[in-house]
Regions:
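Conserved, mostly hydrophobic/aromatic
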Residues: 5, 24, 101, 161, ...
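Short Gly/charged-rich anion-binding patches and loops
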Residues: 19, 145, 187, 219, ...
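Hydrophobic residues within beta-strands of alpha/beta enzymes
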Residues: 32-34, 101, 159, 199, ...
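Conserved residues at the C-terminal ends of beta-strands
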Residues: 35, 104, 162, 202, ...
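Extended substrate/RNA-proximal surfaces in nucleic-acid metabolism proteins
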Residues: 53-194, 279-282
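C-terminal regulatory/interaction regions
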Residues: 255-260, 269-282
């Protein structure tokens, strides 16, 4: 068992590094990783604020790395990509003891402004109207184009919540099955596969009742299976009781779609993790 997408009080998590690691040990996970939000170039309440604090974050993980006997602890980051603004992902790899990087888009750029898609729905709606003139197709296209640019130029180990642009959509603006959206998502997933980047299936929207499906949703599982795209289960946990949130449900949905194994970055494990493994229980 594993869980690599997890946050602490260094960013917007609710629990400390020590508390999150202790929880992973109690769940007897084989691999547990912390992936704090890397600093972004503007003041906010959700990311690690700066490089100095990032160094403290990695030092704190190192302090508790050997907290438990049976769980291997990994230190990662969830890095945002904003062309021309965010630091290159190589900065985090070069300057910190970063085991892996999750590449995610939370801010969609357009004409010098940035649409924050991960806050309250009012901000989502307001940003869509103010930054994209209410044009959901232009906004969705910009999101996926920015994601593909990140994959091409930054080469993260893992692609984070890749259809999160639909988080506050809830059928109001665009149908996830609209060929316009599906083509953009499939293009993004194909590029991830070509770049050997693992696609996370993120459960946070479900257990937080923020979304009706995973990121990306079940509607794309058949395509992932057909194209043999490597996937990883992810909780995006911000508290100790979330680190394997809805993993049992996700495991069953993956198996139902014919996906029989998941993957971790090669620096953690080069072998697929079978969903039929009796140890793979939650």
């Amino acid at each position: 068992m594993y869980s690599l997408h997890n946050h602490t009080t260094f960013c917007d998590g609710k629990k400390t590094v020590k508390e999150m690691i202790e929880s992973a040990c109690r769940e007897n996970l084989e691999h547990f990783g912390l992936s704090g939000h890397a600093p972004v170039p503007y003041e906010n309440k959700w990311s690690i604020p700066d490089d100095e604090k990032t160094a403290e974050y990695f030092a704190e993980i190192e302090k508790y790395r050997h907290q438990c006997e049976n769980t291997i602890i990994w230190s990662g980051l969830e890095a945002d990509y904003i062309a021309g603004l965010s630091k290159p992902f190589s900065h985090w790899r070069k300057n910190f003891n970063c085991s892996y990087l999750i590449g995610s888009i939370h801010l969609v750029a357009n004409a010098g402004q940035h649409w924050f898609i991960d806050g309250p729905s009012e901000g989502y709606d307001g940003g869509l109207n103010d930054i994209f003139g209410g044009d959901i197709r232009a906004a969705v296209k910009a999101y996926y184009r920015q994601t593909c640019e990140m994959l091409e130029t930054q080469n993260p180990d893992i692609l984070g919540h890749c259809d999160k642009v639909l988080m506050h959509n809830r059928g109001r603006y665009i149908d996830f099955a609209d060929p316009f959206h599906l083509d953009l998502l499939k293009e993004t997933l194909q590029l991830a596969a070509e770049k050997n980047i693992i696609v996370e299936i993120n459960t946070r929207g479900i257990y937080r009742n923020l979304h009706t499906d995973y990121y990306p949703g079940k509607y794309i599982f058949g395509f992932l299976k057909e194209k043999n795209i490597r996937v990883m289960m992810s909780a995006d946990a911000h508290d100790t009781d979330q680190i394997t949130g809805e993993f049992s449900r996700l495991k069953n949905d993956l198996l139902e779609a014919g996906i029989k194994e998941t993957w971790l970055p090669p620096q953690i494990s080069t072998d697929p993790i079978s969903l039929f493994n009796p140890d793979f229980q939650f």
